[in-house]
Amino acid sequence: MSSTWEKIDKNKIKLSVEVDENRVEDALEQAYKKVVKQVEIPGFRKGKVPRKILENRFGPEVLYEDAIEILVPEAYQEALEEHEIEPVDQPEIDIDQMEKGQPLKFNATVEVKPEVELGTYKGLEVEKEKVEVTEEDVENELKQMQEQHAEYEDVEDGEAENGDRLVIDFEGYVDGEPIEGGQAENHNIELGSNQFIPGFEEQLVGSKPGEEKEVKVTFPEDYQNEELKGKEATFNVKVKEIKKKNLLPIDDEFAKDVSDFDTLEEFKNDIRNRLEEEAERAAEQQVEEQVVTKALENAEVEIPQPMIDQEVDNMLKEFEQNLSYQGLNLDTYYKLANTDEDAMKEQFKGSAETRVKRNLVLEAIKDEEGITATEEEIDEEINKIAEQAQQEADKIKEFLEMQGRMSQLKNEIAIRKSVDLLKDEAKVTVVEKSNDSEEETQGNTE
């Protein structure tokens, strides 16, 4: 087999492939064995017609289609590997010559992975928020835990107040018609939590156990269901139970109950350390996002549409998987959100293009710097996967090799190292954390 290629557009090439007549003959023989099973000719049992008679009766072309289906995929893949071409879409195949006793000649036109023109990616100037955990942060964390470990007691005669937890049945109506999905029984709601439509919870303040109330609300203009935006609704609500929240005092006993520490002071120190670690990770993540974003902005690449379309499909699959964790599927979501697959794909396009460009630019940096994954790093990554999957590392490695995913794993490790390079080479200025603006910490740079 021989093949050549030429560039016919920025991200499109044409492969010209010639397969020798011996391989063509082998493919024709395979095609004959398939076709003969379907042919009936008087004087011969079905499937027993000699090839020469078959070709004389129907012409040698009767085998060409099946032979081409055998030869072209094989030869196309061999040509890609020979010239180290990375296609990003299915090829357009044009058969130039297919004759018995002659080589097969065909052209394959396909869009390929684009070339990236890297800009500046070292010495990028970025900012990092100063990591600082205050006493107020620690106290807020304790209050959240206090809320989580609150105890509730039934209210027999009193009225519901903000902070109380109610068990209710409700039915919702718009223009006298039931709202789809607007009914529930034994639903838990905490007054003042703003979980429901604005105005709903407020009208239940002062209610008593066993009381039935009519609650009137207006759906917000930005409500996710298009059919309910701005609509007035009535909910028939029955208050079945009222439970009053009792907060445990934050003291040494509280620390013992909710942690492994004996004193509140020890517990607070642990919280402070954890918050500092979380804040440091968040600050580092911001630095990473900044350097990658700037590297992307400085690079130039023309992304083929098939790559964006493929990433959109990947994002839709990821979204579908996340829905499944909540017991939903795409069809149900489309109905609830009054949308469809085309609208979702359109919504994903911008993010998909950014994701594709990110991968292309980071791969280009990896190649430019000669970054690879070491055997130690590969083993470490496999051990992490094995630990998460509660499997033996050898079995995970064997599985990855069987699936042909080892090269993908190596590439992912190398890409992460490329991001680390951007961070290590960046000029980082530490700034004070502020809601309105960030003031530079004088003389404090990394």
From Swiss-Prot:
One of its GO terms (biological process) is protein unfolding. It is found in: Cytoplasm. Gene3D superfamilies: 3.10.50.40, Trigger factor ribosome-binding domain (3.30.70.1050), Trigger factor, C-terminal domain (1.10.3120.10). Its EC number is 5.2.1.8. One of its GO terms (molecular function) is peptidyl-prolyl cis-trans isomerase activity. Involved in protein export. Acts as a chaperone by maintaining the newly synthesized protein in an open conformation. Functions as a peptidyl-prolyl cis-trans isomerase. One of its GO terms (cellular component) is cytoplasm. Consists of 3 domains; the N-terminus binds the ribosome, the middle domain has PPIase activity, while the C-terminus has intrinsic chaperone activity on its own. Keywords: Cell cycle, Cell division, Chaperone, Cytoplasm, Isomerase, Rotamase. Belongs to the FKBP-type PPIase family. Tig subfamily. This is Trigger factor. InterPro entries: PPIase_dom_sf, PPIase_FKBP_dom, Trig_fac, Trigger_fac_C, Trigger_fac_C_sf, Trigger_fac_ribosome-bd_bac, Trigger_fac_ribosome-bd_sf, Trigger_fact/SurA_dom_sf. Pfam families: FKBP_C, Trigger_C, Trigger_N. Residues 163-248 form the PPIase FKBP-type domain. It catalyses: [protein]-peptidylproline (omega=180) = [protein]-peptidylproline (omega=0). Its main location: cytoplasm.
